[in-house]
A protein has these predicted regions:
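"A position-specific structural signal for the A-helix of alpha-solenoid helical repeats
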Residues: 24, 31, 70, 77, ...
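A cross-kingdom marker for long, charged
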Residues: 139-164
Length: 164
């Protein structure tokens, strides 16, 4: 993931106004941060870099559904890992912003299985069992989606496995 993030940084230098250069920078840093400890990720400043790249993506292309999904997960994961107070003060993580980004992602990509899966994951991180019915409903919707490509097929199968 770090190599891919570095390639995205090169793409940002060459194409600073390309939203996907910024999105894939955030995406790969985010995936990398999920593979290391929260302490290590915080020390490396990954949270701020992810937020900056996602914000730039959305500045360039406000209807970028995947960036809205990722921004929603950014807020949800920060809150889940370090709490609302510290996450909010340090990284600007906010439940309302997370929910707004998930809502926009669904608005821009209403049939996308990954948007529904990540929204479900975000709801669970933010609310736990209190929103279990909503989490389940989103996974059911994702599992019943029609795949447009191989990646969506894998997403649908993932949603189905969550329901078993």
């Amino acid at each position: 993931f770090l190599e891919a993030a570095e390639r995205a940084e090169q793409a940002i230098e060459e194409m600073p106004d390309d939203p996907n250069s910024h999105y894939f920078h955030a995406f790969n840093l985010g995936r990398y941060s999920q593979s290391i400890s929260i302490v290590k990720a915080l020390k490396q400043g990954i949270g701020g870099k992810v937020q900056k790249s996602l914000s730039r993506t959305l500045d360039l292309l406000p209807e970028h559904a995947d960036a809205h999904t990722a921004m929603g997960m950014y807020h949800a994961e920060i809150i889940d890992k370090i709490g609302k107070l510290v996450g909010g003060m340090t990284y600007g993580a906010d439940v309302k912003q997370a929910m707004e980004h998930f809502r926009k992602a669904l608005e821009f990509a209403p049939h996308s299985p990954i948007v529904k899966i990540e929204y479900a994951n975000g709801l669970y991180l933010l609310y736990g069992d209190k929103r279990w019915d909503d989490v389940s409903e989103l996974n059911v919707e994702a599992s019943e989606a029609k795949a447009l490509d191989a990646m969506e097929r894998l997403d649908i199968e993932s949603a189905r496995s969550e329901l078993e």
